[in-house]
Design a protein with these regions (language model features):
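Residue-level recognition of single "structural anchor" positions
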Residues: 1-315
Length: 315
C-alpha cells in the first residue's frame, strides 16, 4: 500500500458544489422526482443552511441526503466524497480519520455505511454464465514468505464460498465471497470442509441467476490444489485483511469481503462513479444496527503473525 503521505497528496479537494451535483445525479439519475408524489418539478429553497428541493405539486421538501446512505450525517459532503475516493485503496478507519480530519468513530461509521451500499450493489448483481466455485476458510494464518495459508491448531475458521463468473479465457468477470453461516457453517467446521455440496447448492440458489435449476449447480472445490483465478483472488483478500486491519472478526467479515470484491472488479474511475451511484440509491444503516449482535455466526479468533526476520539482507 502507498504511504500515508502519498495517499494524502492523491486525495482530491472536492468542492461542495461538485459533491452536491454528483449526489443529485446519483439520487435522481433521470431527473428530480418528488419522493412523495413523483412530480418532476421543484423549487430550490434553503433552510438553516441546507439545500432543499420543494415539490411544485405537493410542497414536500426533499434534501439531497434523505433516502441515501448519507442521511442523518453531520459530516460535510466533501469529507464523504473523500472517503469514497479512499475506498478505492481500501484503508483502515484509523487512517481515514487522519486523512479527512474526523474522529475515529465517524471514520468507522462512514466506512461501514459505504460497505453497506456496496453490499446492496452486490446483492442486486447475481453471478451468471460459466461459473467456478471454491470452498475456503477465513481464520488461517498467512505466511508471506511461504506464500501459503497455514491452519492454526484449535481455531474454528469461518467457512467461505468463493464464486465467480468466468469469460472464455477463464478470467473473472464477476466475483463473490460469502460466509457460510449458521448450522451449515458448524457442520462444515466439524467435517473439515467448507460446507460441501450443501454450501455450494445454497450459494448457487442465493447468488446465481437461475440458481434453482439443476443444471446450474456446480461442485464445490476445496483445497489449495493450484493457482486458479479464484485461489489468487482469495489469497489477495486474506492478505489485504491481514495487512490493513490485522484481521477481521466474524460480525463484519462479510462487509469487508464485499468491499474487496467490489474494488477488484472495478477500475478506479469506474469504482468511484459506481460507489457514488449506489450511495445515492441505498438507504442508510444506523450505528446501532451495525454494532448490534448478529446471530448465526460463531466467534472465531484471527491469528496473524509476522515471520521473524532472518537478519540477512538481499544483495
Amino acid at each position: 500500500m502507498p504511504s500515508r503521505f502519498s495517499i494524502r497528496d492523491s486525495v482530491p479537494a472536492f468542492s461542495t458544489a461538485d459533491c452536491e451535483h454528483a449526489l443529485f445525479a446519483a439520487k435522481w439519475p433521470e431527473g428530480f422526482r418528488c419522493p412523495r408524489c413523483g412530480h418532476p418539478h421543484y423549487y430550490e429553497v434553503s433552510s438553516r443552511g441546507r439545500r432543499l428541493f420543494e415539490c411544485r405539486s405537493c410542497s414536500h421538501q426533499a434534501s439531497l441526503t434523505a433516502g441515501t446512505v448519507l442521511e442523518g450525517s453531520r459530516t460535510p459532503l466533501t469529507k464523504w466524497f473523500q472517503a469514497m475516493f479512499l475506498m478505492q485503496i481500501g484503508i483502515s478507519a484509523r487512517l481515514l480519520a487522519e486523512l479527512i480530519d474526523v474522529t475515529y468513530k465517524t471514520a468507522w461509521l462512514i466506512n461501514h455505511k459505504l460497505r453497506h451500499a456496496i453490499g446492496e450493489w452486490d446483492r442486486e448483481r447475481p453471478l451468471e454464465g460459466d461459473l467456478q466455485l471454491l470452498g475456503e476458510y477465513y481464520g488461517y494464518e498467512y505466511h508471506r514468505y511461504l506464500g501459503s495459508l497455514i491452519v492454526q491448531q484449535g481455531l474454528k475458521p469461518q467457512p467461505i464460498v468463493v464464486g465467480a463468473s468466468l469469460d472464455g479465457a477463464g478470467d473473472i468477470v464477476h466475483l463473490k465471497m460469502k460466509a457460510v453461516d449458521g448450522p451449515e457453517g458448524d457442520d462444515a467446521a466439524r467435517r473439515g470442509g467448507a460446507g460441501g455440496e450443501e454450501a455450494a447448492e445454497r450459494f448457487v440458489q442465493k447468488h446465481v441467476v437461475g440458481g434453482g435449476a439443476d443444471d446450474r449447480a456446480e461442485r464445490l472445490e476445496r483445497g489449495h490444489r493450484g493457482p486458479t483465478a479464484l485461489h489468487i483472488a482469495w489469497r489477495e483478500a486474506v492478505r489485504w485483511l491481514a495487512w490493513t486491519f490485522g484481521g477481521i472478526g466474524p460480525k463484519h467479515l462479510q462487509a469487508y469481503l464485499n468491499e474487496y470484491c467490489f474494488r477488484r472488479l472495478l477500475c478506479r474511475n469506474d469504482m468511484l462513479a459506481e460507489l457514488i451511484a449506489c450511495c445515492g440509491t441505498t438507504k442508510t444503516i444506523t450505528y446501532r444496527r451495525l454494532v448490534g449482535s448478529r446471530s448465526g455466526i460463531r466467534p472465531i479468533p484471527w491469528a496473524y503473525r509476522r515471520p521473524a526476520r532472518s537478519g540477512r539482507r538481499a544483495g
